[in-house]
Amino acid sequence: MHSLIKDLKARNLINNITNEEKLIKALEKNKGIYVGFDPSADSLHLGNYIMIMLLKRFRLYNIKTLALVGGATGMIGDPSGKSAERNLLDKTILEKNIAKIKFQLEKFTNSQVINNYVFYENMTFLDFLRDVGKLININYLLEKEIINSRLSVGISYTEFSYNLLQGYDFLQLYKNDNIAIQAGGSDQWGNITTGIEMIRKNLGDDNIACGLTINLLTNSEGKKFGKSEKGAIYLDENKSTVYEMYQFLINQSDADVEKLLNFLTLIDVEEIKKIMQAHKNNPALRVAQKALAKAVVVDIHGQQKYEQALHISEVLFNGSISTLNQEELEIAIKSLPATKLDKDEIKIIDLLNLANISSSNRIARDFLNTGSILINDIKINDENFLVKKQDAINQKFSIIRKGKRNYFLILWNKD
């Protein structure tokens, strides 16, 4: 068994392989691997990061890697895993998304990046029917789960054709770019096998085209990885701050962290076992979560940004917000639940209720009497205390802390 396949299996990454013998042969012949990325948003997110890391794993073994941006397929929308028709993206938005996704893929994967629109820009509809449609039988498509599951509720010819486009992508890359392996999530099996069938029909049985799918990364509750309560954690720090990403990772459960270390980092499998043993010896230290957060954040945003996120976390949970500089403070408040005020002052009890920090006057008084409430690092005990805009940080916002770890942002009205 090839040592790369051995590593992927040890990490429990592999869901299925179309033909392991061909996969080994492709690796031995230095054939490349590609992964497709959907430009449905203007940034990749942590869920996509699994496939980015897969490309990095192959690069460690000097295997050619290619990232394919779906400029053409993105105009249609992949029906895989969808129970209803997808809305078509506006072309202007799609082009902006493609440019941003391409930039991220070049940055994070260090791979060749191709927009699959180049395969179709000069192809007429009649060309498509003759050169692509003739390669695949309708019955073959109808048997696929991604299409069959939609027949009862309906599927447009547009989405029905998606499978052919992704299959044709594989054929083009196999013929022209020395690519013999396609990888994707477990929901991509049907699309991958269509490409292999097209290659067989076009080039004969003596080919080494193969595919592998990666296990869906879900948490212990069965939910897809990569989303916080506020939504997806994006790789673009303008959409999700580095601090938000760090907090998302550091707060992963003990039940999930070993799987995440295997899926999302290049840390050696044996080293992960040692990390988990150290974690089990003293779970309160969160050794495994810290290793996960450091590995992922450093890989995506760099050491300096990681250290900044770590510093913000340590200050918010153990120190004083007054020690944060302006940049760090602005990063920190982006992740806090916010309440806007259109007045210049408010009673503390009313504010606690308004910001959903307490659910009643009685509970608000209890928080105050037990010294649980701090505003901009100042403990408030007086239930008649007036919170004023003039005392806010830069007269723009106040930060309320309840207990040791719960922070809330108050945004004051502009003059």
Curated annotation (Swiss-Prot):
Domain of life: Bacteria
SUPFAM superfamilies assigned to the protein according to its UniProt record, in alphabetical order: Alpha-L RNA-binding motif (SSF55174), Nucleotidylyl transferase (SSF52374)
Protein name (record): Tyrosine--tRNA ligase
Name of encoding gene: tyrS
Location(s) in or outside the cell: Cytoplasm
GO BP term, example: tyrosyl-tRNA aminoacylation
Principal localisation: cytoplasm
Renumbered ranges of motif 'KMSKS' region: 224-228
Binding of L-tyrosine, residues: 34, 162, 166
PROSITE patterns (alphabetical): AA_TRNA_LIGASE_I, S4
EC number: 6.1.1.1
UniProt catalytic activity: tRNA(Tyr) + L-tyrosine + ATP = L-tyrosyl-tRNA(Tyr) + AMP + diphosphate + H(+)
A GO term for molecular function: RNA binding
Motif ('HIGH' region) on chain: 39-48
One Pfam family hit: tRNA-synt_1b
Organism: Ureaplasma parvum serovar 3 (strain ATCC 700970)
